[in-house]
């Protein structure tokens, strides 16, 4: 597959050897399955703010603190620099949350780094190496559903104890 423009710098730097296929496209990012040496990972390319379909971005960012007063003022004013800082803050918050949730014992993809709006992370697969299906595509027994629900509730408790929760 042809390497998308936003992934080309990672390929040039040797972080990605090959783009295998697109995995999904969502309101905030496009995700591709990539090969890094002998390991298969995924690359999440965040969409630029102008191309995202976040209808309530202001609410999403509400309560996120920025310690650097210059950055905070620029973000409040909405200058070009401020918008870039807001993007960087939002992307770094996701990476930080992944590390924090992992330390709390929640099963999340391991991040390998965020490079110019591209998050390189672990691809979660089943025993055969197949990508996990979307929940809407899964059928399971009532017993399996109860077991999975109990596990998810344990993860929610761990997330709350870590001071984080996610709507997805």
List where the protein language model places each region.
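Conserved ATP-binding subdomain of kinase catalytic cores across diverse folds
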Residues: 1-131, 161
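Short C-lobe core helix of eukaryotic-like protein kinase catalytic domains
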Residues: 153-160
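AlphaC helix of the protein kinase catalytic domain
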Residues: 129-141
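Catalytic-loop of the protein kinase fold
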Residues: 161-168
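Gly/Ser/Thr-rich active-site loops/lids in small-molecule metabolic enzymes
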Residues: 144
């Amino acid at each position: 597959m042809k390497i998308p423009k936003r992934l080309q710098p990672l390929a040039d730097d040797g972080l990605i050897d090959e783009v295998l296929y697109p995995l999904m496209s969502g309101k905030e990012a496009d995700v591709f399955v990539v090969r890094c040496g002998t390991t298969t990972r995924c690359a999440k390319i965040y969409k630029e703010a102008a191309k995202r379909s976040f209808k309530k971005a202001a609410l999403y960012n509400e309560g996120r603190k920025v310690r650097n007063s210059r950055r905070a003022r620029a973000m409040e004013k909405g200058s070009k620099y401020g918008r870039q800082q807001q993007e960087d803050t939002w992307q770094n918050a996701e990476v930080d949350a992944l590390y924090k949730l992992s330390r709390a014992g929640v099963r999340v993809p391991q991040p390998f780094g965020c490079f110019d709006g591209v998050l390189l992370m672990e691809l979660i697969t089943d025993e055969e190496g197949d990508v996990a299906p979307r929940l809407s595509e899964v059928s399971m027994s009532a017993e399996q559903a109860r077991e999975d629900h109990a596990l998810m509730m344990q993860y929610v408790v761990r997330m709350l104890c870590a001071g984080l929760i996610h709507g997805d």
